[in-house]
Amino acid sequence: MGFFIWQKFWDATRVDVVVTGIEDQAQLTLEEASDLHVEIDIEQLDLEAGVTPTLFFDGVELDDESHEISETGITWDPEPLEEGVHVLAMSIGRPLLDDAKFTWTFAVDGTPPVIDVVSPQPAVPICTPVTVSGQIEKGLASFQIDGEDAEVDEDGGFTLEFDQAPLGPILLTAEDQAGNRAAAEIVIPVEYPSTQGIHVTAAAWGYDPLREHVLEMVDAGKVSAVQLDIKDEGGIVGYDTDVDLAHEIGAVRQEYVLEEAIDLLKSKGVRVIGRIVAFRDGPLARWASENDRMDWVIQDNEGGVLSKYGGFTNVANADVREYNIDLAEEAIDRGVDEILWDYVRRPEGDIEQMVFPGLQVPDDSPEAEKRAVNDNVVSFLAESGRMVRDRCVYQGASLFGIAARNPDAIGQPVPDIARNVDYIAPMLYPSHWVRGEYRVDHPNAQPYDIVEASLSDFQRKAAGSGVAFNLWVQDFSIGIPYGPEEVRAQIEAAADLGVENWLLWNATVRYTPDAITPEMVKRPDGSLRPGS
């Protein structure tokens, strides 16, 4: 009988608790803690019999307004909680027995994990192994590098090893036990060799007087590099290429033998830059329109080829991309030291008058379409850059002067492009600016001032990327005669900003050697060239 009485007494006073909304030792983010809802179900709760609960938070008894007690348990909806460790406790009074006590300890953590790594990393020689070390907090739920789980030592240290510096940013992501996430990018730039060069068209190299003019500048130590056109603004490939599509579309015009030109220039100690005009390509656009390949071109709103520049090809089209990358790969195989992309953009003008077949746009707004074009330009450079980097060659991109201020107008977002090329070649020709631009009264008459103002803007936009700069310099006259003083002023403005790399531009390949002084031309290692 005594056992029976005791069993009945125990059943009447035993407390079974089920909690939802919080767990002991839980880790909550600030967001989770701001919307916390806790229910404590107490199966044997009998308020009339004296089985009554009292709730405490961080050692303080909660008032009746902060929670609700019913016949089935307690509901607690606290105000947003601060970061730190908290304790929720409950005491239930029982007749003739000590109170039943329960506690739930949990932490509110709204601070994302810290990823401590230097970016950009110091520039390293191209095609050499590189190691990057960093530190993260211990005890993370996950740590990934470019989407793959990464190893971390017991002190939170990590090490990344590469056969060579990868082109483009490396993405690090971390998540702590509370679910807070953090991300960081690592950019590893490569050392870009000192470059002072001139633009040379295929036709100019094939024309004896102009070729001799170029070689005289080389022999006089006026340049350390020569830029040769691989594919020009007219879409013409100026040598006998092995890329079949170039022949099929009628783009080949053999002005020179590429290998012979490269061998001659390298024998004289200068580097060779292969320039490829990417998406401004009349021959490819015409061929595409005549052969039911309209997805290869930018269209007007009536479905025809956009007439600007004689036809602009579509950066979102895989075949167009492949054609350009095939030409770049061939130029590298034949010996160029760099690939310099030009017209790696969309045409300027109202994007609502342009149709990009296959372009993935999240909504129908012009802003979304501009961003999608920007993303495709960047992804093209990332795609080509992987091929170029694998061959231990540099990749550059010529950018319109307005790209720093209005990238969406042409599809050239400077910060993103800077992370996917080895150098930017901004085209800041003084004659191309309107009066008052960058607060320069008469840019064409003030070459130093406009280059200093616009180039510094490019540098600000590219900050954090480690990208090098290689300035296009105006060596031609529009409106105001340009001679040695005007050409030199642009070079000096860049040098005063720490940019000593430059390329002279003259569409007719008739340059001003007297503009170049000995201290302006250096070997790739930065030392002065003999004869300069």
Regions found by a protein language model. Give the residues of each.
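Catalytic domains of carbohydrate-active enzymes, especially glycoside hydrolases
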Residues: 211-236, 334-338, 497-500
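Aromatic-lined carbohydrate-binding/catalytic grooves of carbohydrate-active enzymes
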Residues: 221-255, 355-357
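Glycine-rich, aromatic-flanked loop segments that form ligand/cofactor-binding clefts
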Residues: 225-227, 257-305, 338-342
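Aromatic-lined carbohydrate-recognition surfaces of secreted/lumenal glycan-active proteins
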Residues: 271-281, 340-343, 371-410, 465-477
